[in-house]
Swiss-Prot record:
Name of protein: ATP phosphoribosyltransferase
Enzyme superclass (EC): transferase
Location in the cell: Cytoplasm
Domain of life: Bacteria
Originating gene: hisG
Length: 219
């Protein structure tokens, strides 16, 4: 199977967006149509394989060479810090990584005055780096879901989380006070694969660059 090019893709919307983009450069997999519960899909004619994995696991599959390429959010790459080649911003999956707090705190405090705070987040590494650069001492509480709940029940005064529209935060009485960064989906490549399958992988990257440039020109 070493002649296959293998992609690791997050299950759900990012996988669908990825396959729509790949189709524009002739990379397709008819086996993926429908609601299959399979986790590995192949196109024997074109020698492409696709693995459906958890978003946070994509970098690991690519790092260890189980996949040659992957698509993953920049937030995951920043949090995990793995040694991966990241040639392309794919321009979809846009959201923002923000610091948020209850509205009453926002009215009474200036973020510039923070010195020692408690923050709940799925992104402890990013959060620690961000506040360390500002000279703010932070106590981190790692959660895996429903981050907005933490300030409501007194677990933490503030949170760091991804937002797209911000509706969930507003519905829970939270306001964004700082933006850590803008997040989009990225193409990542295993460094060994880039050498052993250089021609095919380079062609994929170049074709995607062309399509992304064309799409940007049409906006």
């Amino acid at each position: 199977m070493s002649d296959y090019i293998t992609f690791a893709l997050p299950k759900g919307r990012i996988m669908r967006d990825s396959m729509e983009l790949f189709a524009k450069i002739g990379i397709t997999c008819p086996e993926m149509s429908g609601d299959s519960r399979k986790l590995v899909f192949e196109n024997p004619e074109t020698k492409f394989r696709f693995m459906a994995v958890r978003a946070t696991d994509v970098p690991t599959y690519v790092e260890y060479g189980c996949a040659d390429l992957g698509v993953v959010g920049k937030d995951t790459l920043l949090e995990q810090g793995k040694d991966l080649y990241e040639p392309l911003d794919l321009k979809f999956g846009y959201c923002r990584l923000v610091v948020a707090e209850p509205g009453e705190l926002s009215r009474d405090e200036d973020p510039a005055d923070w010195s020692n705070i408690r923050v709940a987040t799925k992104y402890p590494n990013i959060t620690e780096r961000y506040f360390a650069e500002r000279g703010v001492q932070v106590e981190l509480i790692k959660l895996y879901g429903s981050i907005e709940l933490a300030p409501l029940v007194g677990l933490a005064e503030r949170i760091v989380d991804l937002v797209s529209t911000g509706a969930t935060m507003r519905d829970n009485g939270l306001v964004e006070v700082e933006t850590i960064g803008e997040i989009t989906s990225r193409l990542i490549v295993n460094r060994a694969s880039l050498k052993t399958k250089h021609q095919r992988i380079t062609r994929i990257i170049q074709d995607l660059e062309r399509v992304l440039a064309e799409d940007a020109g049409n906006d």
